[in-house]
C-alpha cells in the first residue's frame, strides 16, 4: 500500500511521515520510506545522524541506471534516452516488488539500523550548488515517479512518501501514484486552505484523500478541523514529548509515544488498509499523464513519439509481475 504525505510547509508532514513509518515498523510491517521533499529531512526524523543522512545515495544521481533497469526488454522503448519520468511499463519492462533485492534497491535503498531494520529509505536528493538558478526540484523526483510506475506492491507492505509542500505535487502525475494521500493539516486558516486547494485539484482524478490534524491542542482545534475538512479528518496528533526528544537527538524509544498519538497512527493505518488497490485505474492514469507530458514537452525534448511507448494491452499489477517471472 502506498501513502503520500503532503501539506503546507511547516505543517509537520515530515514528522508525521516518520511517526507513521515507525508505527508500521513497530508492527513488523515491511516499509519503504521515500523522501521526496526539497528539504530532505526524513532521514534525520528517522534517527539518522547528519553524516549518515548526507551519505545516502540519491535516486536522482542514478537516473540513467534506473531507466536502463526498468526498461528491461520492452520493445516499445527504443532506449533509455527515450524514457521520461512518466514512461509507463509495458510487456518486457522490469517490474519491482517492495521487498525484493534488485538493481534499483541496491543503488538507492538503505536499510535502517536497530528496531527499524524492516525499513528501507530512499531519497530523491536535494538541490546542489550546480542546480541553483537552472533547475526546478521536479527534475529531482522523476526517478521516484518512474519507480512508482513500475512498483507492484501489496497489502501489509507499505511505501510512505514525504512529498513536496503544498500544491507542488501537482506539477506531475506523481499525485496519482498512491492508494491514499494524507493531508497533514494544522488548525489554522492557511493550513486548511492548502487542504482545500489540494482537494480541488485532485477531485477529477479519483484520488483518495484523508486528513490528519497536527499540532492539535484541544477540542476547539478538533472542531475547527472537522468544520473545514469534514469526513476526511480521520485522526489528530497533539504535542508530543517523544517527538521533541527525537528532534533534540534523544531517542527515548517508540514505545514512549503518547497513547493518544499511537491511536491516531493506528487509525491512519486502518484508513490505508481499507482502500482497494485498483490497478486498472492506476494504469489508465499513468497513460493519461504520460500522453499529457508527451504532448506538452516530452516529444520535443526527446525527439521521439512518446505516445508510441504505451502498450494498449498491458495492465499493471500482480498478474503482470507474475507474467514476467
Language-model-detected regions and their locations in the chain:
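Hydrophobic anchor at the beta1->P-loop junction of P-loop NTPases
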Residues: 5
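Walker A (P-loop) phosphate-binding loop of P-loop NTPases
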Residues: 9-10
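Conserved lysine of the Walker
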Residues: 13
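Conserved catalytic-core segment of NTP-binding enzymes
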Residues: 19, 134-253
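N-terminal phosphate/diphosphate-binding loop that engages ATP/GTP or pyrophosphate donors
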Residues: 25-115
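Conserved beta-strand scaffold positions in the cores of enzyme catalytic domains, especially
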Residues: 33, 119-121, 233-236
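Cytosolic-facing regulatory segments adjacent to core modules
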Residues: 94-114, 123-159
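C-terminal lobe/tail of nucleotide-utilizing enzymes
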Residues: 201-325
